[in-house]
Amino acid sequence: LNNIIVFGDSAGAHIAAQAVLLATNPEYERAIGVSSAITAEQLSGAVLYCGPYDVSKMLNTGNKVIDFFASRIGWALLGEKQWQEGEMIKTTTIKDYTTDQFPPVFISDGNSGSFESQGKDLANHLLSKGRDVTSLFFDRNEYGEVGHEYQFSIGDGGAGSLCYEQTVLFLNRISESRHEMNQ
């Protein structure tokens, strides 16, 4: 397996980003006590849709429903009821563990009821580190409201269709690049 591309959506985008960190940063492996089954050399890229990349930013939003949901997700993910106060919360901030081994990544999110600011923060952080980032975010003035999980609406010619097209272009580009490297 030498052309692995990890995909994730919503919480799965966070998990996919963690898989990238495990493969590219031994410090992260030690911090969470998990060894990666894949190496950085095996990774060709990552596709991250609508994900939270800094779980601590999901706390105390002022919305009781979101706060309750976030508290339960954190508890399930980290195994501690008071997870907000534990050491593991530090490991949920993806950008704190990125290295120059981070593979090409496609990051996208809607602009309503999702994690757009976290996606933009991660994309900008990776760009500032010289990483290969393709991102797709939506201006409300041009696209209107684009919600969480928008990418599954691919038949309407709107944001979901654009995401599909951009994702295919990204995958083709990184696959061709990987193929050229291996020749």
Report each predicted region and the residues it spans:
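Alpha/beta-hydrolase superfamily serine-hydrolase fold, recognizing
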Residues: 1-183
